[in-house]
Amino acid sequence: MRTAIPLAVLFTTLACSLASAPAHARARVFVASYGNDMNPCTFGSPCKTFQVAVNAVDAGGEVTAIDSAGFGPISINKAVTITSPDGVEAGIVANAGADAIDINAGSSDAIVLRGLTLDGAGTAHNGIVFSAGGSLTVTNCTLQNFAFDGSNLPTGNGILMQPTAGTLAFTITNTTASNNGGTGILFLTSSGGSPSVNGVIDHVVADANHFDGVSVDSRFTTGGAIVVTVSDSIASNNGSQGIFAGNGSATLKVSLDNVTVGGNFFGIVASTPANVLLGRSVITGNGTGVQNSTSPNTFYSYGDNRINLNGTDGYSSLNTTFITH
């Protein structure tokens, strides 16, 4: 015998089900110059700012700029892709004394930034600050005009990676970091950090930054392992070092392949505990070409580099006992 369900019970059950059902999934959302942050961030009704769109998108989803405009600074705490298609210039002009993009996400979260132009306007602190997350990919981006503030270190950087622990992978490709008051791309762990890091910097230009072009500085580490490959890239016209690797207690390995380093005060500088492998590269027009203070000598040159026409070349300090295995 079948018992009918009273209508009141049916309506109550349906109401509870609807209340507990998840909101409509938004795996992809949109921003546009004509958008409104009260909109649902769909293609037909886009939002106005990146921050509202990032808040609206599902974890692991994508935020896409429909047209060229400035879309405001962002704080990211989940996996997300933020992209600007070819022909669209999605900009972020950061606020004075602040960062354009701050990332503090979960240990397995992947963050992808593609086709963005970040400008500090001579007053903002940093372009991208990565404090926590699983991976960071920066592709086809421009980071410029961020300001060094001597009372707030580190500032003035195009990209600042400062993880304290955990495992991090980063890839920076086809990107330019220029005219920043600090360093173009700076890896500098927070105090007491011991992260495990695997990074790639490829087809990158770090030019006319006040301090360094690319710096892998493990001075605050108490352990961990950092492996970074720099390939097919240019570090030029930087006020201090074109490329730096060293300091701290982490196991630090930096491979430099087919890089051009010119017009810097120092071309390439390495200090203990860095292991540096240099091949197929041109170091010229610097005040000092290479400066090696690793002990024991772990700055290896493979005989296929052109270290010439610097104020002081410095190549005699390199380890030419070639590693062949």
Predicted regions and their residues:
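Bacterial N-terminal signal peptides
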Residues: 8-17
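Boundary of Sec targeting at the N-terminus
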Residues: 24-26
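Acidic Gly/Asp/Thr-rich repetitive segments characteristic of extracellular carbohydrate-active
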Residues: 33-66, 70-72
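Short, T/G/N/S-enriched strand-turn elements that build extracellular solenoid repeat scaffolds
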Residues: 51-57, 70-78, 82, 101-105, ...
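Right-handed parallel beta-helix/beta-spiral solenoid domain characteristic of secreted/periplasmic
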Residues: 79-127, 142-151
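Right-handed parallel beta-helix
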Residues: 86, 109-120, 135-149, 166-183, ...
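Extracellular beta-strand/beta-solenoid scaffold signature
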Residues: 94-104, 121-130, 151-164, 179-193, ...
